[in-house]
């Protein structure tokens, strides 16, 4: 059964703190093994990549076969169900519309001294997109990563996706084409991350790597950070639902299970000021589990990491929600807009009973690549700015240099950097 915490109980604070500290990923120390793979690919390139692909994916391939051909992608698209392709196109179009509104504008102005200042935005030249492989790979995630890069103007988007024993979900290749991916390679794991970061004879290096993966992929992204940029280190998914007595227990239960079926380590949380609703939701979860195809995974998630938190009022719910800083936050109350305005920490907020988080996963338009494990306290979901960089611009004429130069020289000398002061002074003399 999920944990039950009641803010009216004397032990609430320590129990809530323990709940926040719960670790949902238990893995052996894989840093050394990952480092060996990364270093090998950095040193030996294609040879190491091909060996690792044979070992881990049971796929024999040569350098020429690492890249999916246009004919293979055409065949994959042709194999896809027409209705599913139409749904992917709808998702692509809505994701593009939402993300185009994030495009920043260059800025240039002249201050009171006549100094010109500004900022210029440019797209990252090349980005790598990691996609988990196998038949369960998610084409929606391809769109969520690729479309913002396309909108940002990234010239080269490279996708890597493992194809264990040669198997791949054709929808993943179809989504890549719809999302504007430039190149697709049948490699995965830490070796694929290393290839993107360091480059091989076949795969040219990129400047940034985005996309989710297993513990080895996460470790590899940590290890190559600095050589390239990365988006985030994603943990198991999570949803928090805040509801009052107006909430529909069956709908809330369905949303909690939609998150729980992702992964046995996923987390579904309900905060409510209604004890009756809490009981109804718990019963509805059990009823719906009985008919869920992925019931084993969902039940493990709900029993091990699920939580029902009772509060005296919604003011308490706001405080707790900010502490949890959930990846997904659904608000099903009489005034969801008013409550949302008071919450600072959440990856994405879904307002009202007719906005299930699953709509955001697929066709809402907002991005479903979101900060997990309380990192919404300091980070945001994936967006256009993750694929762009800002360059500042400064221009002084002779008059402006004369006005600012003496102060710059004073500060340079104060810091013991005489050459700094001199580089200004030679222009003033």
Curated annotation (Swiss-Prot):
GO terms for cellular component: cytosol. NAD(+) binds at residues 130, 191, 214. Pathway: Amino-acid biosynthesis; L-histidine biosynthesis; L-histidine from 5-phospho-alpha-D-ribose 1-diphosphate: step 9/9. InterPro entries: Ald_DH/histidinol_DH (IPR016161), Histidinol_DH_CS (IPR001692), Histidinol_DH_monofunct (IPR022695), Hstdl_DH (IPR012131). One of its GO terms (molecular function) is zinc ion binding. The active site is at residues 327-328. GO terms for biological process: L-histidine biosynthetic process. Its EC number is 1.1.1.23. Binds 1 zinc ion per subunit. Substrate binds at residues 237, 259, 262, 328, 361, 415, 420. It catalyses: L-histidinol + 2 NAD(+) + H2O = L-histidine + 2 NADH + 3 H(+). Belongs to the histidinol dehydrogenase family. Catalyzes the sequential NAD-dependent oxidations of L-histidinol to L-histidinaldehyde and then to L-histidine. This is Histidinol dehydrogenase. The gene is hisD.
């Amino acid at each position: 059964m999920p944990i039950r915490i009641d803010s009216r109980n004397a032990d609430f604070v320590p129990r809530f703190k323990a709940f926040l500290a719960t670790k949902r990923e238990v893995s052996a120390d894989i840093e050394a093994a990952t480092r060996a793979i990364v270093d090998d690919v950095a040193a030996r390139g294609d040879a190491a990549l091909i060996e690792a692909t044979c070992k881990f994916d049971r796929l024999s391939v040569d350098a020429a076969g690492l890249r999916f051909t246009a004919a293979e992608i055409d065949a994959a698209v042709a194999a896809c169900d027409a209705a599913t392709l139409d749904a992917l196109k709808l998702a692509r179009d809505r994701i593009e519309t939402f993300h185009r509104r994030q495009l920043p504008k260059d800025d240039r102005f002249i201050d009171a001294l006549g100094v010109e200042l500004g900022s210029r935005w440019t797209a990252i030249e090349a980005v790598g997109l990691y996609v988990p492989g196998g038949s369960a790979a998610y084409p929606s995630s391809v769109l969520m990563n690729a479309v913002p890069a396309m909108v940002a103007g990234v010239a080269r988007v490279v996708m890597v996706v493992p194809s264990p024993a040669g198997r791949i979900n054709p929808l993943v290749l179809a989504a890549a084409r719809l999302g504007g991916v430039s190149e697709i390679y049948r490699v995965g794991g830490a070796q694929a991350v290393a290839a993107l970061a360091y480059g091989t004879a076949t795969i040219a290096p990129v400047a940034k790597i985005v996309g989710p993966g297993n513990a080895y992929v996460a470790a590899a992204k940590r290890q190559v950070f600095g050589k390239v940029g990365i988006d985030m280190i994603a943990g198991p998914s999570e949803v928090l639902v805040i509801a009052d007595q107006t909430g529909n227990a069956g709908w809330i239960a369905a949303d909690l299970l939609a998150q729980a079926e992702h992964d046995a380590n996923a987390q579904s949380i309900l905060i409510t000021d209604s004890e009756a609703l809490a009981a109804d939701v718990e019963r509805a979860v059990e009823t719906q589990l009985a008919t869920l195809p992925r019931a084993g995974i969902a039940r493990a998630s709900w029993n091990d990491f699920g939580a029902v938190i009772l509060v005296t009022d919604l003011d308490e719910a706001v405080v707790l929600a900010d502490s949890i800083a959930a990846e997904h936050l659904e608000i099903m109350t009489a005034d969801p807009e008013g409550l949302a305005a008071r919450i600072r920490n959440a990856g994405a907020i879904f307002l009202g009973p007719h906005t299930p988080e699953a709509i955001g996963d697929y066709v809402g338009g907002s991005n479903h690549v979101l900060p997990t494990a309380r990192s919404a306290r300091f980070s945001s979901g994936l967006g256009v700015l993750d694929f762009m960089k800002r360059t500042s611009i400064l221009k002084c004429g002779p008059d402006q240099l004369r006005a600012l130069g003496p102060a710059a020289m004073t500060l340079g000398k104060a810091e013991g950097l005489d050459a700094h002061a001199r580089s200004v002074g030679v222009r003033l003399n």
